[in-house]
Amino acid sequence: MEVHNSLHCTAPVLSSLQASASGSGTPKKTAASSAAAQNSKQLLDQLSQQQKAQEEAETHSRRDCDSPASSNSEPEKDLDELRDLNGSLTGSGSVGKSNGSLSGASSTTSAPAGTSTPGSANTNGSASGAASLSVVSATAHLKKRITSSRTPTRKAHRIKFYRNGDRFYPGITIPVSNERYRSFESLYEDLTRLLEENVKIPGAVRTIYDMVGKKITALEELEDGQSYVCSCNNENFKKVDYNTSSQPLANLTLANNSRTSSHRLAKLQRPASPLKNGVPNSIAPVPVGGGAAANGSPLNTSRFSERDSVVHPRIVTLIRNGTKPRRIIRLLLNKRNSPSFDHVLTAITQVVRLDTGYVRKVFTLSGVSVLQLSDFFGSDDVFFAYGTERVNTVDDFKLESEEQRAINAIRKTLRTAGTACKGPKPKMPVKSKKAYPPGELKAQAEAQLQASAAPANEDEEQAALLKSTGVEVAELPAAIRDNYTLSQIIGDGNFAIVLKIKDRQTGIPHALKIIDKSKCKGKEHYIDAEVRVMKKLHHPHIISLIMDVDQDTNMYLVLEYVSGGDLFDAITQVTRFSESQSRIMIRHLGSAMSYLHSMGIVHRDIKPENLLVELDDFGNVVQLKLADFGLACEVTEPLYAVCGTPTYVAPEILLEVGYGLKIDVWAAGIILYILLCGFPPFVAPDNQQEPLFDAIISGVYEFPDPYWSDIGDGVRDLIANMLQSDPDVRFTSEDILDHYWTMGNEEIGCGDYSR
């Protein structure tokens, strides 16, 4: 049965009321019948409008809809109810449909003329009144049904999304339909916003995969009740066991006023370091949603406080149960993958890949069973991983010579015991005035040695540098010339010079960087990238960009001014810093890097020359800021360009196997080493490039006495984890901030690596 585009009433639907009006002549009954007829007419008009709206929606929308039969049956049911009511009112009636029109006729057998009696009149009047009330009541009921959503539209799919590669994130569920999202871009934007509220992501969502890694290219491919994986910055699909058992799909909502406990839990399991945004360590991080008070669970409070007091970033060595010699793997544990004992077992399962499946039992090297979270962060750093198989306590805990050699090789760079330094004290590299872009790093050769010759008169050198730029005061942009006064040159590089300037109104000093475009032909994209990146950055430990003016010959950048100069000069003056001073600087540097990396930006040229410091009256460093973003870029895939400064370059850059954000952590580890002893961990005779690169690739270095004899094990452990040759187990920037030495909690300790 089909309802067509319009509904036309060709005859009075309630003709019985008209017939009774002529037969009885009762005014009361006539009025009631007229009201009922009017209500019925209004009802039919609304049904007609509803049907027209339905057809328009079907014409303009080519989407999957609810069953037409079920949708069309609703108006038919309404008409049937109306017919029944009319029939009960008149005793007989019909409502017919033909060619999209409704026709109705009814007749009433009334008393012959002149035989009307008071009794019959009362009966007819009461019947008519009751029928009228029934029609009015039915009309009101049907109006409610009409106002409800009966227009067939596509039902929104409830779809769960996971973060790519994150096996601990419980996922987030949203309704998806073509009405809600007109394009993939709008869905990407919404997913980016929602994921940022629950978990740290490296950038915007750019790709969606199904659970087997197939790329989704259209909204129609998303199926109701299914789960999908969101990928940021076009990263490849990571096949892991996603947390599909965290909560039933039907129970998850996105209502802002009813966030589920799993969402709060997801954020609590990934606490941002209190140092990440420059907040002092003394200020305890406040859990999202009010912490324990928000979820009302003292158990959660105790569990997370235990994690915060026990868990600190560290690398553990895992021996996979199997045929000897057994496979040995390293794993980085931190607050993001180790919020609980079960999470650690899951992380171990992913890397050891037992034939029997999930890791069920873990033992220390001495055969002691690991039963709680704190056992992974004690003095032991080597563990045996077992599934459901039986443990042979006699043979399994004995290491073969090949296994022992492999573990000793891993521990070699984790030794805290100093070795005597042979020969003279190594020297700091000569201060570099330039960062070497791709293709120029290895061609540097011995230019740094020659640069150590005494310069000419400083004033003459500055005048020559200023003249070499071809910039006259009159040529400066009006926005700079009218608002600032020029002062001395405070720095120079390969493509630019930096002058100190002052605001004419406030007297506040700033730095003016003048980039000569003629000196960087073919490298203009580095200038554009520097400006583009700096415009995005707002952090207390990153130099701020105040103004940029682009002209045909030069690019002008007005930057924040830091009075203490760069860290290289500070190291030259004091040779080495105390642990407390070094802690302040690595906190600030780690905070800046963590901020950059959270935005998917890698600096690629972190070195003392690009770190500016503020000093107090006693010459102590009170603040450090990261500067010079000439090589910075956004990471959307592995990078291969060989660039940076030789002393601070990471091994994966030299090996040209692809690198990412963690090259900045390596450079920061080199700097921390230098701060404490006055020379870098990797040196070569006469600063020769190839031997230096070979030493970096080997990853072997020492903490030689007497230069390290008074330096504690905590900072050595941090350096060892920052200078891991394998990027997968190297600390992240947040791990630097979470390390017990950085936080000043050295009583926690991290085990003895001297054995």
Curated annotation (Swiss-Prot):
Listed Polar residues bias regions: 87-99
Pfam families cross-referenced by the UniProt entry: DCX, Pkinase
Binding site for ATP: I490, G491, D492, G493, N494, F495, A496, I497, V498, K513
Biased composition (Basic and acidic residues): 53-66, 74-84
Residues annotated as the enzyme's active site: D605
UniProt enzyme class: transferase
EC id: 2.7.11.1
One Gene Ontology MF term: protein serine kinase activity
SMART domains: DCX, S_TKc
Every Protein kinase domain range: 484-742
Region of interest: Disordered: 18-128
Reactions catalysed according to its record: L-seryl-[protein] + ATP = O-phospho-L-seryl-[protein] + ADP + H(+); L-threonyl-[protein] + ATP = O-phospho-L-threonyl-[protein] + ADP + H(+)
Doublecortin domain span: 157-243, 314-397
Record key words, sorted: ATP-binding, Kinase, Nucleotide-binding, Phosphoprotein, Repeat, Serine/threonine-protein kinase, Transferase
Biased composition (Low complexity): 18-52, 100-128
GO biological process assignments: intracellular signal transduction
Similarity-based family: Belongs to the protein kinase superfamily. CAMK Ser/Thr protein kinase family. CaMK subfamily.
Stated name of the protein: Serine/threonine-protein kinase GL21140
